[in-house]
Amino acid sequence: MTSYTFTRELRLLTPAQFQAVFTNPVKASSAEITLLATPNTQEHPRVGLTVPKKQVKRAHDRNRVKRVIRESFRMHQHDLPSLDIVVLVRKGVMDLENPELHKLVDKLWRKLSRRFNG
């Protein structure tokens, strides 16, 4: 049975892990969200989220965005290659409802997979 949990091993935790992604990333982006990714040595993808206060003012809105992105990653983790992924959120994300945001992030996961799998 395939596990769809979102454990600590599936997250980027330290500044060094984030910095490794920022040095030489492959990008997949839309107007509201950018994904930066680099291959990792793990056997699974890992994700880190940045939702700046400057772009998304209220804490409950930042939490909503992060929750939707984490849930989307959790459901697509087995479709993604072994990558370290940083999700950058821009201002326009506040205009999206949860289903629209989920659909957008799903599309970006597929785009990123195609770039690494050929």
From Swiss-Prot:
Keyword Hydrolase: yes
Catalytic reactions of this protein: Endonucleolytic cleavage of RNA, removing 5'-extranucleotides from tRNA precursor
Molecular function per GO: 3'-tRNA processing endoribonuclease activity; ribonuclease P activity; tRNA binding
Enzyme class: hydrolase
An annotated GO BP: tRNA 5'-leader removal
One GO CC annotation: ribonuclease P complex
Signal peptide: none
Keywords in alphabetical order: Endonuclease, Hydrolase, Nuclease, RNA-binding, tRNA processing
One Pfam family this sequence matches: Ribonuclease_P
Keyword Transmembrane in record: no
InterPro entries: Ribosomal_Su5_D2-typ_SF, Ribsml_uS5_D2-typ_fold_subgr, RNase_P, RNase_P_CS
Family matches, as HAMAP family: RNase_P
Cited function: RNaseP catalyzes the removal of the 5'-leader sequence from pre-tRNA to produce the mature 5'-terminus. It can also cleave other RNA substrates such as 4.5S RNA. The protein component plays an auxiliary but essential role in vivo by binding to the 5'-leader sequence and broadening the substrate specificity of the ribozyme.
Protein name, per record: Ribonuclease P protein component
